[in-house]
Regions:
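ABC transporter nucleotide-binding domains
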Residues: 1-242, 325-327
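Short catalytic/signature loops enriched in Gly
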Residues: 5-7, 26, 234-327
Length: 327
């Protein structure tokens, strides 16, 4: 039996809460998450807007300190001193969804990619490093792009410049927040193929944050589905997306164009992280509970009153659902 590799980056019972205004309850944006990412692995973190996935990504990057739990990178707890974070962010780089907002319109492509090298005091050949990063990102010949400005590039080319700016520091892990959301459909596949190629060529790890389960299917080794601050289902992407067990995952999948049957329309109010309900946090919107299936399975009371608990961060198929566990 092949031993399981330890996680390169892991969240251990991470909580992130923001103070409420005018005496309101704290907003529990991340409410207890275990999640591991191994070397050379792409993990998709999926959920609708407001579920806490971007806040979790920011906590993993050290941009926001957890209010509970912690982050471990390469076997060591993440420290929040300036020097430690600077060293950490050389090894873990962020790729944002909007390349137009990420790139300074006054800077050339060369300066945009070289910025990280200058921040981290790179001592080698800067021009060679920039050229190699642009080439790896698919902008060839790289010298042709050195003096261009963002407005002279297509959306896909701008996103490749952003990726080159991350690659130039030779990171071990990328955190990509909706990396193709702002791109045309014709370009999305090219950027996803680029991320897969970088994983294969450089043994890069990646956390891809997205609301799109179709994107997760095309790029990820493993998927983690997030709802109201918690991971509610996780496992290898093929197993989770071909046989989803959590009603929320089923609802997300049902709206994909190729999904069989009618889309599942979730009732009730969108999740509010300052008012996490008792029991299963999805129960107020759960079609299984509303349709009587949970009652017939004998778990309706548990759905309303008993927290299913925090899933572990390993690669096994797991679900935080009383009804799924009873089947």
């Amino acid at each position: 039996m092949t031993p399981v590799k330890p996680a390169l980056l892991s969240a251990n019972r991470v909580h992130v809460a923001f103070p409420g205004l005018h005496g309101a309850p704290d907003a529990r944006a991340v409410d207890g998450v275990d999640l591991g990412i191994r070397r050379g692995e792409i993990v998709a973190l999926v959920g609708e807007s407001g579920c806490g996935k971007t806040t979790l990504a920011r906590a993993l990057l050290g941009l926001v300190a957890p209010t509970g739990g912690g982050v471990v990178f390469d076997g060591r707890p993440l420290e929040y001193s300036g020097r430690s974070l600077k060293a950490y962010r050389k090894r873990v780089q962020l790729v944002l969804q909007d390349p137009s907002g990420s790139l300074n319109p006054r800077h050339t492509v060369y300066d945009a990619v070289a910025e990280g090298l200058r921040i981290h005091g790179h001592r080698g050949d800067e021009q060679a490093a920039v050229a190699e990063a642009l080439s790896r990102a698919g902008l060839r010949p790289p010298e042709r792009f050195f003096l261009r400005h963002p407005h002279e590039l297509s959306g896909g080319q701008r996103q490749r410049v952003v990726i080159a700016g991350a690659l130039v520091l030779e990171p071990e892990l990328l955190v990509a927040d909706e990396p193709v959301a702002s791109l045309d459909a014709s370009v999305r596949g090219e950027i996803l193929a680029l991320l897969l190629r970088l994983r294969d060529e450089l043994a890069l790890s990646a956390l891809v944050v997205t609301h799109d389960l179709g994107l997760a299917w095309n790029i990820a080794d493993r998927v983690a589905v997030m709802y109201l601050g918690r991971i509610v289902e996780t496992g290898p992407v093929e197993q989770v997306l071909t046989a989803p067990r959590h009603p929320y995952t089923r609802a997300l999948l049902s709206v994909l164009p190729e999904a069989p049957g009618d889309p599942v329309v979730l009732t009730g109010e969108p999740p509010d992280p300052s008012r996490v309900p008792p029991g299963c946090r999805f129960h107020a919107r759960c079609p299984i509970l509303a349709g009587g299936e949970a009652e017939r399975a004998g778990v309706a009371e548990a759905c309303r009153t008993r927290d299913p608990g925090i899933l572990t961060g390993d690669d096994t198929v797991q679900v935080a659902c009383h009804w799924a566990a009873a089947r």
